[in-house]
Amino acid sequence: MQMAPQMGYDRAITVFSPDGRLFQVEYAREAVKRGTTAVGIKAADGVVLLVDKRITSRLVEAESIEKIFQIDDHIGAATSGLVADARSLVDRARVEAQVNRVSYDELIGVEVISKKICDHKQTYTQYGGVRPYGTALLIAGVDDNKPRLFETDPSGALLEYKATAIGAGRNAVVEVFEADYREDMNIDAAILLGMDALYKAAEGKFDAGTLEVGVVSLEDKKFRKLGPEEVENYVHQILEKHKGNENKE
């Protein structure tokens, strides 16, 4: 009988615990922590998104797993957490971008679209009969000739970063970024840094077939995903680097 009050605030999204916590939101964050590792890095000449898709079966077609999405011409998003929840939020972001284009005849701002997604997420933390989104998004793009990178949390919180990560390998990736990130690095250097961080987070268990890379450059302000040959080239550089380090040891 003593457990009944606890079960109430543990299960209900609208009920705070005595110490001010919303457990369902915290559980949604745990879903993100169990997800694939996604990385975002701002460079001097653009912004980069990378995801290790973590394919667990050789029977799965790698191309069928998508973790980096185009939101608008100048905006991309990387996801971690529940795949279906992420797809729903990506679809909503695309609609918001198109509505802004039709209504105002201009591209939506990266911060604006990020806030709209966070506002939507936040509503799912305060109404009965719903659950929080079990996914986080890294939203990257170019605003006013500046690279922008935002993280959206399941609670609806929004933070802008120079470099960050979401998913299972977040701690390992952030440790690399804190040691090696530089604001003056270019897109190529940012991609290599992101891959190096993913390599360490995955303990060396990755290859070009499991990686997705998206970039938005200041030069053309267009989002694009790197092709397999481009990804393979960067992966080769990382593997050669670590092979050389092992030989030195």
Swiss-Prot record:
Entry keywords, A to Z: Cytoplasm, Proteasome
Keyword Cytoplasm in record: yes
Gene Ontology BP, a term: ubiquitin-dependent protein catabolic process
Molecular function GO labels: threonine-type endopeptidase activity
UniProt keyword annotation of Cytoplasm present: yes
GO terms under cellular component: cytoplasm; proteasome core complex, alpha-subunit complex
Domain of life: Archaea
Matches recorded under InterPro entries: Ntn_hydrolases_N (IPR029055), Proteasome_alpha (IPR050115), Proteasome_alpha-type (IPR023332), Proteasome_asu_arc (IPR019982), Proteasome_asu_N (IPR000426), Proteasome_sua/b (IPR001353)
SMART domains in alphabetical order: Proteasome_A_N
Locations listed in the record: Cytoplasm
Summary of activators and inhibitors of this protein: The formation of the proteasomal ATPase PAN-20S proteasome complex, via the docking of the C-termini of PAN into the intersubunit pockets in the alpha-rings, triggers opening of the gate for substrate entry. Interconversion between the open-gate and close-gate conformations leads to a dynamic regulation of the 20S proteasome proteolysis activity.
Family indicated by similarity: Belongs to the peptidase T1A family.
Function in brief: Component of the proteasome core, a large protease complex with broad specificity involved in protein degradation.
Subunit-structure text: The 20S proteasome core is composed of 14 alpha and 14 beta subunits that assemble into four stacked heptameric rings, resulting in a barrel-shaped structure. The two inner rings, each composed of seven catalytic beta subunits, are sandwiched by two outer rings, each composed of seven alpha subunits. The catalytic chamber with the active sites is on the inside of the barrel. Has a gated structure, the ends of the cylinder being occluded by the N-termini of the alpha-subunits. Is capped at one or both ends by the proteasome regulatory ATPase, PAN.
Protein name per its UniProtKB record: Proteasome subunit alpha
